[in-house]
């Protein structure tokens, strides 16, 4: 049987409170956390799964549910935004690792490690608009996998979008 629960979040609740974790933990074999989409389609540009946020999500969850029941979902994809000179931005489009690396090559820029723990590419146009891409590679994913230590396991979204070299380590 599948157990599903939905509760509308209210302004006085943070991300953790729409679900009654303790009750869910008492009736499920495993609880799979969506440890991605911190920055999503309609948010400002930013990382999909910042490491500090993943640590906070893990800490809160295991305060409510035994770690051996928790699976941490991690992103194999990234997000790509166009940012205008006035600060407005496009919807964050999903992007595969391979596509991000192809754009970096085309734009002649090197991905850099972002303070959130992911990779970041920025390409600036003469009009001061820019492209911003936040994504994961093998190294950044291995750091995120370490965050899952003490949990039941990990899951990934979405197969086929990853840095293929990660499979040598899984």
Give names to the regions the model predicted.
Residues 41-48, 130-134, 156:
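Second-shell loop/turn segments in exported
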Residues 69, 132, 153:
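A residue-level signal for beta-strand positions that form part of recognition/binding surfaces
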Residues 74-145, 166:
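Glycan-binding loop/region signatures in secreted carbohydrate-active enzymes
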């Amino acid at each position: 049987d599948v157990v599903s629960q939905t509760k509308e979040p209210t302004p006085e609740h943070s991300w953790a409170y729409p679900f009654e974790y303790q009750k869910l933990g008492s009736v499920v074999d495993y609880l799979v956390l969506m440890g991605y989409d911190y920055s999503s389609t309609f948010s400002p540009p930013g990382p999909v799964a910042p490491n500090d946020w993943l640590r906070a999500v893990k800490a809160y969850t295991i305060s409510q549910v035994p770690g051996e029941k928790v699976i941490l979902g991690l992103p194999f994809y990234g997000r790509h935004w166009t940012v205008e000179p006035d600060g407005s931005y496009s919807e964050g489009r999903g992007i595969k690792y391979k596509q991000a690396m192809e754009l970096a090559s085309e734009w002649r820029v090197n991905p850099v490690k972002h303070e959130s723990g992911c990779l970041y590419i920025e390409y600036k146009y003469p009009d001061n608009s820019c492209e911003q891409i936040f994504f994961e590679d093998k190294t950044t994913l291995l750091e995120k996998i370490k965050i899952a230590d003490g949990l039941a396991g990990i899951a990934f979204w979405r197969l086929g979008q990853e840095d293929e070299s990660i499979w040598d380590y899984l």
